[in-house]
Amino acid sequence: MAIFSNQMRLSSTLLKRLHQRVAAAVNSSSSRNFTTTEGHRPTIVHKRSLDILHDPWFNKGTAFSFTERDRLHIRGLLPPNVMSFEQQIARFMADLKRLEVQARDGPSDPYVLAKWRILNRLHDRNETLYYKVLMENIEEYAPIVYTPTVGLVCQKYSGLFRRPRGMYFSAEDRGEMMSMVYNWPADQVDMIVVTDGSRILGLGDLGIQGIGIAIGKLDLYVAAAGINPQRVLPVMIDVGTDNENLLKDPLYLGLQDHRLDGEEYIEVIDEFMEAVFTRWPHVIVQFEDFQSKWAFKLLQRYRNNYRMFNDDIQGTAGVAIAGLLGAVRAQGRPMIDFPKMKIVVAGAGSAGIGVLNAARKTMARMLGNTEIAFESARSQFWVVDAKGLITEARENVDPDARPFARKIKEIERQGLSEGATLAEVVREVKPDVLLGLSACGGLFSKEVLEALKHSTSTRPAIFPMSNPTRNAECTPEEAFSILGENIIFASGSPFKDVDLGNGHVGHCNQANNMFLFPGIGLGTLLSGSRIVSDGMLQAAAECLAAYITEEEVLKGIIYPSISRIRDITKEVAAAVVKEAIEEDLAEGYREMDSRELRKLDEAQISEFVENNMWSPDYPTLVYKKD
């Protein structure tokens, strides 16, 4: 009965979220205005003349009115035609479209890099217009400012570098970081994305060039979550690089030393964390693309003391859980059947282990959260790494992967052995889901996909989640051509839907972390939660899973369109705030203290979130002497 009641409790939570998607929001006549943003009051600036035109936070370009041009001493420094926001966007889009026509028949890399350069130049001179363009064209430009193009940008960053963005802390700065943080001009920082460049996407050690991924992530925090761009900070911690090509490159911008390791490495990260939380006690720090060796250790070291999370581990896991729950629905099964799903996972790095741990916890929660439940959940996973199937017979198993090592007697009954190939495991296990987090492009070969034909599921799910595109374990064309149309396909990188003929379309879902991390960050910020708890992450994943309607699920759609990212983020953030309140972690945000926050119902929480999402609009600027 305990197991049944837990199943029903989880199921009812998800059903409630599904019903909320259908039900219209009820507007109470006595509803309060929960916004704590500045609104449309004039903004005081302490710059004039060329200084204001060279400041991307305040520069409006040709949109400055004549009264502002007089006030700010910029009359005559701009062309006389005062252009509207819409006209500026149209001019910028015309430039990009001309580039698209010129590059249509050329190689793809120069094309996307040229687009990135144009967007980056706009970012450097006018942040408001940049984010307006990005928000209004998010489906087209998210792949340019974020994955997959950001991977190419990081590889070429030393050559592309023109103007600094963010902060750089290095091994040479030991003992100085506490004072260095005061070199950043913003007195308030809400969100930091930090990397050490050791494992950028699936591209390996890119050293200091990895800051490109932190910049791209924060662009999405602004565009999707409405974090104020003046309160975000991309950070690179340069502890050296083991990339021999970079060490030999005279144009490389980072330290040309091998990476620090052991206690020396930990001391640098500790000093950084102490410094940023001393200056900005309420900041949220997202760790990004740290190698597996350190990702879990740093997460466990800091998560109970600081407002931080690791997107590669926790964000990827949440997106995968939402997709797996969607796959259960798409297979025509009740949500509580999730613990019965057989899942083969290719990849045992930080992302793979993060997904495994989250899926195991979700299954165990459905089964009653007992020791027996955790053991039962463990038995639903088969993990394959570069050496093959991981079993208890494996020597020197990574401690994080050890809980998922298969027992010898179990696999012998299945006709498998230690080190069995992925194709052999898929053929014998007949899984409901094949999940790829290996960063090994093409790993789901024809042999592997042919083996999946024997799945016991009537609609098997394939998740090649590795980024960037070249690291995807398979393409949708390969999957649909071998397995037919009755599959669920979700990838980490964007792919176009596949024309299957006869008017049928193979839907390509994108299992993109951007569906979750902006909402997790925004919800943590607005709740004032002391930490980012497992419950808050679970609430985010369940909210995303419930966002898709039954009609969409039946068509094989388990993730929403990126064009809806702003609304998705609002709902995810509201779910995170609600969970933080229920766990008694919420301490409030600015004027909304914890007592007022606890009085809000679900509709009011959603309103509170929406009212505190920054939107790109030009404020009236008024000059005041320092």
Curated annotation (Swiss-Prot):
Cellular component terms (Gene Ontology): mitochondrial matrix
Annotated EC: 1.1.1.39
GO biological process, one term: pyruvate metabolic process
Keywords: Metal-binding, Mitochondrion, NAD, Oxidoreductase, Transit peptide
Record's keyword annotation contains NAD: yes
Details of cofactor binding: Divalent metal cations. Prefers magnesium or manganese.
Cofactors named for this entry: Mg(2+); Mn(2+)
InterPro entries per record: Aminoacid_DH-like_N_sf (IPR046346), Malic_enzyme_CS (IPR015884), Malic_N_dom (IPR012301), Malic_N_dom_sf (IPR037062), Malic_NAD-bd (IPR012302), Malic_OxRdtase (IPR001891), NAD(P)-bd_dom_sf (IPR036291)
CDD domains: NAD_bind_1_malic_enz
Residues holding a divalent metal cation: E288, D289, D312
Protein location: Mitochondrion matrix
Record's catalysed reaction(s): (S)-malate + NAD(+) = pyruvate + CO2 + NADH
Residues annotated as catalytic: Y146, K217
Feature: transit peptide: 1-34
One GO MF term attached to the UniProt entry: NAD binding
Residues reported in the UniProt entry to bind (S)-malate: R199, N467, N512
Phosphoprotein among keywords: no
Domain of life: Eukaryota
Binding site for fumarate: R91, R125
Ligand binding (NAD(+)): R199, A348, A351
Family annotation (PANTHER family): MALIC ENZYME-RELATED, NADP-DEPENDENT MALIC ENZYME
Sequence similarity: Belongs to the malic enzymes family.
Subunit structure and binding partners: Heterodimer of two related subunits.
Protein name: NAD-dependent malic enzyme, mitochondrial
Biological source species: Solanum tuberosum
